[in-house]
Swiss-Prot record:
Keywords: Cytoplasm, Exonuclease, Hydrolase, Nuclease. It comes from the Bacteria. One of its GO terms (molecular function) is exodeoxyribonuclease VII activity. Its EC number is 3.1.11.6. The gene is xseB. GO terms for cellular component: cytosol; exodeoxyribonuclease VII complex. Bidirectionally degrades single-stranded DNA into large acid-insoluble oligonucleotides, which are then degraded further into small acid-soluble oligonucleotides. Heterooligomer composed of large and small subunits. This is Exodeoxyribonuclease 7 small subunit.
Length: 70
């Protein structure tokens, strides 16, 4: 079983991909592959953030202090 990357590792990898695409010194085929990888990472990061938000909302609701998280 492979260890799933941490949020921070995925974010750092996404930032590296964005920088390489922005500098324009990457071959087209590599840019397409990097873009696709970046989209996957972006979706994974968003899912992690959504899960964290739901967890916080649940904790706050159980505590009785807040019922909506925005």
């Amino acid at each position: 079983m492979s260890k799933q990357k941490k949020f921070e590792e995925n974010l750092a990898e996404l930032e590296t991909i964005v920088q390489s695409l922005e500098n324009g010194e990457i071959a087209l085929e590599d840019a397409i592959t990097a873009f696709q990888k970046g989209m996957v990472l972006s979706k994974e990061l968003q899912a992690t953030l959504d899960k964290a938000e739901k967890t916080l909302v649940k904790v706050m609701q159980e505590d009785g202090t807040e019922s909506d998280f925005e």
